[in-house]
Amino acid sequence: SASNEWIKYSLILSYNTQTESTTYHIVSFKNANDVLNTTLNFNEKYLINNVNKVDDFLFFTDNYNPPRKINVTKQYQYPTTIAGEDDSTVYNDILVIKSPPTKSPSIQNLNTNVQDTFMEERFICFAYRYKYEDDEFSATSQWTSPSFIPKPFNLSIENYLNEGMVNNTNTAIITYNSGPSIVTGIEILFKEANSNIIKIIEEINKTQNGVVNDTDYEYTFTDSKIFTILSEGEILRLYDNVPLLANSQTLMGNRIMYGNYVEGYDLKDVNGNT
């Protein structure tokens, strides 16, 4: 960090020895009385001793901030001003952890005049996940209850079965949230209640579809089509296990490993006491 009487700057930069050019990847600042501390939030008492480069990603941790990374091919936005306004670089943009949707989508079950019977004998649950820059994906949201409303009881004399036990719903209206500005896309997902296979219903590009940030949208699901299947491991990916703080970091088997770390939050009562 370099400092003057009023502002302390924190930088992440790279120098190209061949072109003798400097790239400022991130510029952030802290004002003189330490009230404002933007994006990088470096502290001279907590040195960055652990750095790993994986492809175009530079991972680092200082045991003062959560584990973070940057794309070394990218220049992040500069602060808007040095007069005390927030840094225009979103703090969450450089976190290793990518936040998933905070809750499951909501669904409205309908019986419409569509002829497709895909949902008739299926217990279908819905979820969604966020896509971030650099093709990173969050964990999935929580899953909804099955979209199933039985038809009236109808006992068959021939086989003594309740033939009314089929889905009276053939359409589900799924309401999801578009997420913050660093979310570039949304994938709407479904799975059958008795299966671990997750399928993608729709991939929504926020820019191409004019999707507004942090806004609820609806998607109407009616029929069967050719779905993309997610890898089997996604059903077990309930969350991304990135620590709150980590004192050490290394690369092992193409995985980032953290050591001497802090994870989890203290449980608090209604009064905010731990």
What are these regions (language model features)?
Residues 1-274:
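Disordered, low-complexity "stalk" and linker segments at domain junctions of extracellular
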